[in-house]
Every structure is written in structure tokens, then in C-alpha cells.
């Protein structure tokens, strides 16, 4: 499983020019399910993200995690994180899981995340956002 985690002052997901979900200050999290991923790997990623000390603490230090704050999280599925770009001009996505398998694990990832942390929203799996 791959994830890109970014601090944001706010973020929103638009689908067909309508706001689907949005958050205030917190973390924007892009996740990619790969072929070899399992419940074990997604559970580990949820734990890691919730405990990342990326949020502002005293004097601007990054001392706090999501679980230490009341900030928001927005999770977006992004299969292109698995792109292999080493050869040629066309990326290969052979490391990413097939959509049906990825959807099952993504749903489990979201379930685990929502159980561990309540201030989480998400994009729509497979949608053009």
C-alpha cells in the first residue's frame, strides 16, 4: 500500500462540479492499493497515518498526530501512485491492484480509519475527482 500524506488548511473533493466532501485544517491522504496488499498492510498503514506527527504543536513544531488533535482527514483513492515511470514515456500501473480487489481493501481501509478516528471524510472510489 502506498500513501501520500499532506498537511492542508482545507481541502475539498469535487465530482461533476459539485462538492462531494470537504475538510478544514488537517491531513489530505492519497492512498493506492497494490496487488500484494492485505488486511495486515492496510491496518498497518491506518495506524501509521493516525500516529504521524505532522500537525502543528507549540512554536510551529510538528509535534502532534491526528489522534492528538481534533483536525480533519480527507482520504482519496489514487491508483496512479503505483505508476512505474522508469522506462519510456508511458507509465505502467501493473503494481496497482485490479479495481474490484482495490475497492474491497479501500473500503476496509476506510472502515478501520473511521473506527480509529472520527473526523475523516473521503472521495468516491473510481470517480473522476
Regions found by a protein language model. Give the residues of each.
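N-terminal, polar/charged subdomain of small-to-medium soluble alpha/beta proteins
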Residues: 1-92, 104-128
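C-terminal helical cap/extension that packs against the catalytic core
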Residues: 97-105
Amino acid at each position: 500500500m502506498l500513501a501520500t500524506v499532506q498537511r492542508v488548511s482545507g481541502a475539498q473533493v469535487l465530482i461533476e462540479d459539485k462538492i462531494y466532501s470537504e475538510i478544514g485544517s488537517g491531513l489530505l491522504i492519497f492512498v493506492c492499493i497494490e496487488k500484494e496488499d492485505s488486511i495486515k498492510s492496510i491496518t498497518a498503514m491506518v495506524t501509521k497515518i493516525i500516529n504521524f506527527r505532522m500537525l502543528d504543536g507549540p512554536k510551529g513544531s510538528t509535534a502532534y498526530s491526528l489522534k492528538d488533535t481534533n483536525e480533519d482527514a480527507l482520504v482519496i483513492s489514487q491508483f496512479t501512485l503505483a505508476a512505474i515511470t522508469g522506462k519510456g514515456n508511458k507509465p505502467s500501473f501493473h503494481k496497482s491492484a485490479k479495481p474490484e480487489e482495490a475497492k474491497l481493501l479501500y473500503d476496509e481501509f476506510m472502515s478501520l480509519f473511521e473506527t480509529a478516528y472520527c473526523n475523516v471524510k473521503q472521495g468516491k472510489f473510481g470517480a473522476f475527482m
